[in-house]
Amino acid sequence: LNPPSERYRGEDGKVLVDGIRSINFHNTGLWVGYYTTDLVAVIDLASFQHVSSVEVSALTDLSAWIMGPQSISVFVSLDGEKYEMVSRQTYQAPTDAMGEKRSDLNRLSFDSVPARYIKVVAEPFKGLPKGHSGEGEPPFLFVDEIRVN
C-alpha cells in the first residue's frame, strides 16, 4: 500500500477491503485519502483464484477539494513479483466547479484470469477544475473500498 495522507489513513488501509462502503463524508475514518500521490494497493487473495473484475469506490466532493480518480489500473500476479496489467480505465474531470458530493463504484471488467495478488493503482487528477476556488491546485483522492470478483 502506498502511504496515504497522514490525516486520512483509514486504519492503515484496512478499510479498503473490509466490505463496508462509507457514507459520502471523507472524515468518517472509513476513507483512505491521498494528496499528490497515487493509491497503490496490493491485495493478497491467499490462494489462486479466477478474477474477472475489480471495483473501486471513490469519493467526489469538490467543496472539500476531493475528486475521483483520473485513471484506475488493475494488475494481476501469481507470485507477487511479476504483475501483468489486465485493465485500465480513465475518467473525465467534473465540469461543474462545485458539483455534487457522491461516491462512485468504478468497475473494471476483464477476461477471467488466474491470480493470487491484485494490484490496484488509482491516479488522482493533477488539478481542481476551472472555476473552482482552488483551480489548478491538486485535489485529494479518497477511496473506501476495493472489491475483487
How would you describe each model-predicted region?
Residues 1-22:
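Predominantly extracellular/luminal regions of secreted and cell-surface proteins
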Residues 22-87, 102-149:
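Aromatic, loop-rich ligand-recognition surfaces of beta-strand-rich domains
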Residues 91-97:
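Surface-exposed loop and turn segments in beta-propeller and other repeat-based domains
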Residues 1-2, 92, 112:
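Selective for proline/serine-rich intrinsically disordered segments
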Residues 6, 99-102:
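A broadly tuned preference for mixed-charge, low-complexity surface segments
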